[in-house]
């Protein structure tokens, strides 16, 4: 057939590729061989059972070629050449060749498959031949989007199972192992056969059995696969699964659409099958034709009646609607407001947008139905339809035209009324806008003009208020035009009969009345401001005059008060007399001051009178000064009171200075006697201390006589102390009548006593030294004369340089080298052991007597201790206690250091160190 030839031409190359693939791969896996054998056997039996036969062993039952030819006839629907009935090998080969030739005639190129292998029972070749047949007659006709049969079948499976979870078909081996893909294919086409929601990917055996059982029972697809083989085989045989899945494809494709496959059913078989139906039902055909003719006539008549009834109904409804609408369109009543007209316009637009379009469609449908009805009646030889009176097409058309004219007139009226009312509304809005602006401007103006705020102002603030009022007057004049415009707009609204003229007129009247009040209040405030300015200017002049006079007068008062209460300090009669004279001159000026005070007070009284008369708050505050009349009055009163107090103070001070003058004279008279006496006595004592006259005993006698005379003069000092105490109590610090002060006299008196005592002590020490050292009076006088010669200042002491010069003058040799300096420093350490920096006469005399007389030395004492110690270098405490008195023995034991030399015994004392320490030759 032509389609078969087309398929042969289109798919020939594909078959060759499949056969070559078969030859290359072979059946190396026993599991795959088992699956293919079982699947192919089931597939063959699914077709052979239609011929009333089956096979048990695929490699044995096809060896004679008879069932092979029968299988091809069943699946192709064609008749093959008559088979040979012999049982010889060549008969079998001939039958198999007939089958193979038939396959080749379908465009399938068989490669490496010969009749001999089939006859010999070669399982591999037999399965390959069956797979070729399956490809040609079961899979080849599967075509999806111009893909190969295998790819098309795979794509078909993917599309059908796409909506199902846990199903992802990518191939024909692993993707079908869990059985969900088989169940999904069945459920997609027959959801009534499987409850897919109860299936689980974890139970593949149950899924496979469910799919195979349902397919065999309800879809007439034989059980070609074994679930255990699919589960236990790592990679199931692809060809076995493809063969089985192709049965699903054909089963569901056939259920959806007959003849949709690529290979069409045999034409002769279909014609033969249909002719049987024709002969079966040919007797009932005439009766059916007659019944159909009657039904057709009745149906046309019923349709015509339906159209007539519908026309009547539509015509009545449309005319009734027009009748109800016309009064509304002809109405010209409105509330004379833009909102009311706009509401009517919106109602009209709603009518045109919502209500009329359905009626237009109704009218068009009415005319269409009428024309259709007349045409059908004419074609069916029926009389023309005549509507009831008043419902003809012309009646409806006339009513419709009247409606459209009414609509046009109504719309024109609405637009004209809208324009008129918009004009009125614009004027009303303009009136409102100007009135609002005017009222905003006037808000608070009356209160401002009626305000008495200027009564609280000072002059500068009042002038600012006046300037502000002048600006307001200018602004008021400028607003005159606005008020006139408001009145003109209100007049126009009245002329055009605005619907709310009452409120417009009332508002306009309020504005005009308020404008008149503002004018009157403005003039009244102007007058009040001028009067207030005049009064405040007068007060300001008085304040300024007060400030000019009060400031210098206040300064004079402050200065005067300070002078009157000034705590003056005077020490002489001349000073107090000068103060009294100045105070008398000041009192002479009080008359003029009293006049100035009265003038200042009168200025304040005048201000107070004006403020009280006009009740001006804060008018008494003077902006030019902080001084007040009360300040002036208080200070002037203080001055008047302080003047007599100052008189009394000056009088008291005068009496005090007179008494002080008397005390000065009294102290001076006594001090001028005591001071020279002390000086004379001091000179006499100093002369005696120089030791140049008489013996030491004579000097001592004379000093003691002076001592008695000085103590006898002490009452004069005590009397002078009493006078001095009175002077101090009177705070007298200067005395021009004497050069002596109590301090100088007291110091002189104390120095006199000290000098007498010191000289007595020195003379007594000199006598003791002379007697103990055995020096003569001449030597002593010589030492005194030398000491006094170098004591230039008569201080009774020599500096180191003076002492050195004195030694040289007495014949003492002191070198000028370093050794001489060391010797002199040793001598200074003897005569000035306390390092005071001076050498007194006693130390000088002691040094000179030691140098000039035979005195005891450290060596002499050491020799004495050596005798007591029996020539030992140390001495024991018992030896000291035995030879010396107890007190002197204990004195030596306590002060002698322990002996640290050789051959010492416990308790031994170092008498050598002790002896040298006694004479200052080493540290003890």
From Swiss-Prot:
SMART domains: CH, EFh, efhand_Ca_insen, SPEC. This is Alpha-actinin, sarcomeric. Spectrin repeats lie at residues 251-395, 396-510, 511-631, 632-744. One of its GO terms (molecular function) is actin filament binding. PROSITE patterns: ACTININ_1 (PS00019), ACTININ_2 (PS00020), CH (PS50021), EF_HAND_1 (PS00018), EF_HAND_2 (PS50222). It comes from Drosophila melanogaster. GO terms for cellular component: cell junction; cell projection; cortical actin cytoskeleton; focal adhesion; plasma membrane; Z disc. It is found in: Cytoplasm, Myofibril, Sarcomere, Z line. Residues 778-813, 819-854 form the EF-hand domain. Ca(2+) binds at residues 791, 793, 795, 797, 802. The keyword Cell cycle does not apply. Residues 1-250 are annotated as: Actin-binding. The gene is Actn. The lineage of its organism: Eukaryota, Metazoa, Ecdysozoa, Arthropoda, Hexapoda.
């Amino acid at each position: 057939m032509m389609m078969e030839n087309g398929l042969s031409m289109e798919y020939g190359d594909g078959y060759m590729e499949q056969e070559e693939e078969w030859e290359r791969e072979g059946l190396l896996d026993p599991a795959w061989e088992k699956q293919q054998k079982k699947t192919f056997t089931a597939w063959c039996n699914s077709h052979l059972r239609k011929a009333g036969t089956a096979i048990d062993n695929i490699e044995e039952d096809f060896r004679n070629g008879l069932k092979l030819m029968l299988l091809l006839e069943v699946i192709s629907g064609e008749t093959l050449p008559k088979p040979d009935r012999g049982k010889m090998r060549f008969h079998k080969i001939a039958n198999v060749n007939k089958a193979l030739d038939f396959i080749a005639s379908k465009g399938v190129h068989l490669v490496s498959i010969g009749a001999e292998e089939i006859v010999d029972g070669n399982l591999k070749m037999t399965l390959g031949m069956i797979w070729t047949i399956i490809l040609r007659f079961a899979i080849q006709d599967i075509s999806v989007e111009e893909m190969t049969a295998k790819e098309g079948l795979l794509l078909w499976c993917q599309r059908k199972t796409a909506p199902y979870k846990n199903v992802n078909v990518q191939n024909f081996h692993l993707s079908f192992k869990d059985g969900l893909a088989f169940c999904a294919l069945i459920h997609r086409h027959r959801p009534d056969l499987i409850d897919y929601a109860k299936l689980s990917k974890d139970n593949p055996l149950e899924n496979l059995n469910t799919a195979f059982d349902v397919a065999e029972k309800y879809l007439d697809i034989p059980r070609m696969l074994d679930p255990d083989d699919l589960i236990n085989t790592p990679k199931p045989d692809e060809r076995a699964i493809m063969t089985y899945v192709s049965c699903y494809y054909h089963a569901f494709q056939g259920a959806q659409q007959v003849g949709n496959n690529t290979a069409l059913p045999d034409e002769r078989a279909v014609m033969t099958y249909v002719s049987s139906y024709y002969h079966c039902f040919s007797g009932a055909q005439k009766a059916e034709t007659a019944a159909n003719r009657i039904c057709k006539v009745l149906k046309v008549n019923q349709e015509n009646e339906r159209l007539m009834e519908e026309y009547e109904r539509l015509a009545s409804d449309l005319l009734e609607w027009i009748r109800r609408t016309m009064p509304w369109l002809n109405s010209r009543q409105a509330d004379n407001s833009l909102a009311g007209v706009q509401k009517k316009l919106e109602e009209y637009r709603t009518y045109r947008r919502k209500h009329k379009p359905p009626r237009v469609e109704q009218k068009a449908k009415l005319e269409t139905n009428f024309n259709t009805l007349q045409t059908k009646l004419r074609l069916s030889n029926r009389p023309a339809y005549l509507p009831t009176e008043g419902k003809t097409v012309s009646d409806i058309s006339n009513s419709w035209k009247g409606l459209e004219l009414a609509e046009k007139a109504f719309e024109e009226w609405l637009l004209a009324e809208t324009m008129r009312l918009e004009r009125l509304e614009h004027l009303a809005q303009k009136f409102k806008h100007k009135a609002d602006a005017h009222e905003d401007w006037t808000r608070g103006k009356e209160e401002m003009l009626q305000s008495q705020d200027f009564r609280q102002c000072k002059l500068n603030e009042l002038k600012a208020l006046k300037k502000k009022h002048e600006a307001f007057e200018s602004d008021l004049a400028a607003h005159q035009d606005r008020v006139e415009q408001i009145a003109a707009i209100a007049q126009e609204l009245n002329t055009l009969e605005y619907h709310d003229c009452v409120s417009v007129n009332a508002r306009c009247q309020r504005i005009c009345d308020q404008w008149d009040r503002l004018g009157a209040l403005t003039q009244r405030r102007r007058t009040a401001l001028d009067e207030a300015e005049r009064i405040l200017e007068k007060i300001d002049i008085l304040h300024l005059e007060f400030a000019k006079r009060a400031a210098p007068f206040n300064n004079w008062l402050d200065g005067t008060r300070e002078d009157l209460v000034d705590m003056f300090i005077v020490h002489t009669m001349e000073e107090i007399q000068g103060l009294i004279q100045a105070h008398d001159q000041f009192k002479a000026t009080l008359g003029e001051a009293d006049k100035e005070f009265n003038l200042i007070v009168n200025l304040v009284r005048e201000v107070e009178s004006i403020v009280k008369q006009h009740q001006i708050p804060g008018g008494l505050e003077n902006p030019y000064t902080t001084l007040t009349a009360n300040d002036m009055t208080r200070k002037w009163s203080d001055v008047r009171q302080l003047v007599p107090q100052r008189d009394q103070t000056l009088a008291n001070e005068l009496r005090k200075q007179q008494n002080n003058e008397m005390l000065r004279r009294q102290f001076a008279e006594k001090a001028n006697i005591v001071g020279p006496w002390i000086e004379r006595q001091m000179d006499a004592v100093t002369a005696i201390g120089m030791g140049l006259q008489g013996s030491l005993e004579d000097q001592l006698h004379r000093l003691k006589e002076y001592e008695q005379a000085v103590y006898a003069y002490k009452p004069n000092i005590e009397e002078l102390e009493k006078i001095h105490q009175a002077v101090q109590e009177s705070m007298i610090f200067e005395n021009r009548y004497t050069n002596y002060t109590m301090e100088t006299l007291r110091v002189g008196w104390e120095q006199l006593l000290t000098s007498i005592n010191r000289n007595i002590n020195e003379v007594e020490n000199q006598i003791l030294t002379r007697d103990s050292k055995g020096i003569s009076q001449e030597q002593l006088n010589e030492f005194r004369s030398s000491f006094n010669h170098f004591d230039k200042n008569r201080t009774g002491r020599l500096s180191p340089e003076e002492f050195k010069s004195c030694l040289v003058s007495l014949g003492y040799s002191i070198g000028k080298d370093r050794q001489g300096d060391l010797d002199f420093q040793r001598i200074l350490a003897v005569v000035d052991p306390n390092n005071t920096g001076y050498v007194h006469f006693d130390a000088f005399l002691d040094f000179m007597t030691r140098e000039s007389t035979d005195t005891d030395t450290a060596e002499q004492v050491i020799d004495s201790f050596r005798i007591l110690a029996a020539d030992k270098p140390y001495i024991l405490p018992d030896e000291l206690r035995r030879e010396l008195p107890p007190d002197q023995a204990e004195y030596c034991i306590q002060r002698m250091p322990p002996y640290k030399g050789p051959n010492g015994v416990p308790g031994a004392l170092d008498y050598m160190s002790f002896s040298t320490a006694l004479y200052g030759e080493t540290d003890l």
